[in-house]
């Protein structure tokens, strides 16, 4: 416990320089993580409880790349207006990390703005079955992108929170966008597991660790992304869930 607390203190000190922007919409918060990389957090209610959803956007010399989308269409315009106000650039690309509304919900909106929209073929198949708006462009599980002066990689680690969850890696900044396969350090459980593959989840997390051993920051999909124990905590939550399931059988 003491070791964990010391680690959290060091990490907290590392975040003291984060710049938080004041937004007109109280359900949107934007924080600068790296030179051109920003974490945006939006809030919505699920089964009567308010949750935070985290994702990132990258400002490039060509325009803004948005990973996932604000959680709730009532926040879409406020979000893109805020981006243009801060950076004087438009969103030119949007990538959904899986099919749920807090990730793929903005595909149609961003597409109408003229942005190129992307998802994996697996995510596209799920969205098609659910009669939901889909990305214009699809790719197999893994893909490297270069937008202007920025390179990043989409990686499929395996099943976990959903069958189609992917993560996004920004190598220059050593930032991993974990999406919902990575639980925040303050999560009490695995959250919504109605479409989860819990027995595959551990290996998928190990695949992430092996693929990206030099991560500096992990942005978890929900709640406190600044607690950088999220990867290990996710493994602990999976183990706890499996032990409880075994005990109940």
Swiss-Prot record:
Any one GO molecular function term: zinc ion binding
Residues holding Zn(2+) 2: 102, 180, 222
Cofactor note: Binds 2 Zn(2+) ions per subunit.
Keywords of the record: Antibiotic resistance, Hydrolase, Metal-binding, Periplasm, Signal, Zinc
Chemical reaction(s) catalysed: a beta-lactam + H2O = a substituted beta-amino acid
UniProt: substrate binding residues: 183
Cellular component, GO annotation: periplasmic space
GO biological process, any: antibiotic catabolic process
Residues noted as binding Zn(2+) 1 in the record, renumbered to the chain: 98, 100, 161
EC number(s) per entry: 3.5.2.6
Co-factor requirement: Zn(2+)
Coiled-coil residue windows: none
Signal sequence region: 1-22
Annotated localization: Periplasm
Job of this protein: Confers resistance to the different beta-lactams antibiotics (penicillin, cephalosporin and carbapenem) via the hydrolysis of the beta-lactam ring.
Quaternary assembly: Monomer.
Family statement drawn from the similarity comment of this UniProt entry: Belongs to the metallo-beta-lactamase superfamily. Class-B beta-lactamase family.
Name the record gives this protein: Metallo-beta-lactamase type 2
Organism (species): Elizabethkingia meningoseptica (Chryseobacterium meningosepticum)
Taxonomic lineage of the native organism: Bacteria, Pseudomonadati, Bacteroidota, Flavobacteriia, Flavobacteriales
